[in-house]
Amino acid sequence: MFKLLLVSPDKTSLSGLASALSGYGDVDLSWAEYGKEALDIASNNTIDLVITDEWIGDMTGLEFAERLLTVNPRISCASVSQLSPDEFHAASEGLGLMPQLPDQPGREDAEKLLQHLRSLKGLMGDMRVYDTTNK
C-alpha cells in the first residue's frame, strides 16, 4: 500500500489527480491544506509520496520540498509548477523531486507518478486501474 499526501488549500486543483489515484487499489490518499500541516503529518506518519500544488497557502511547493528534506529525506515529493522545464529543473535541483506536474494534473500524470514511485520502491507491479464506478 502506498501512502500519498496531497497538499493544496484548494482541493479542486488536484481533484483530477486525486480521482485517478483513488482508482488504484494500492493507494491510500490523505490531504493537507497547508505546508506546515503537511510537514507535521510527514514527521509523524509513514508517507511514500507528497504531491503539492504550486502554492500551498504558506509556502510554494518547491519551498515545501526543501523543508521536507529536513523532516524526512526518504519521502518522495512531486509539485505542480508553471515554470518552464528548464526553470523547474534549475529551481528544484538537489531537492530530489519527481517530474514536474502541470496545472490540473490528471490520470496520465497519476500513472506516471505511480510508475516512478513503484520504480523507486522496486515494486514494478500490476499497473491496472480498479474500476470503482461499476460495482
Predicted feature descriptions by range:
Residues 31-49:
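Acidic, metal-coordinating helix/loop segments flanking the phosphotransfer/catalytic sites
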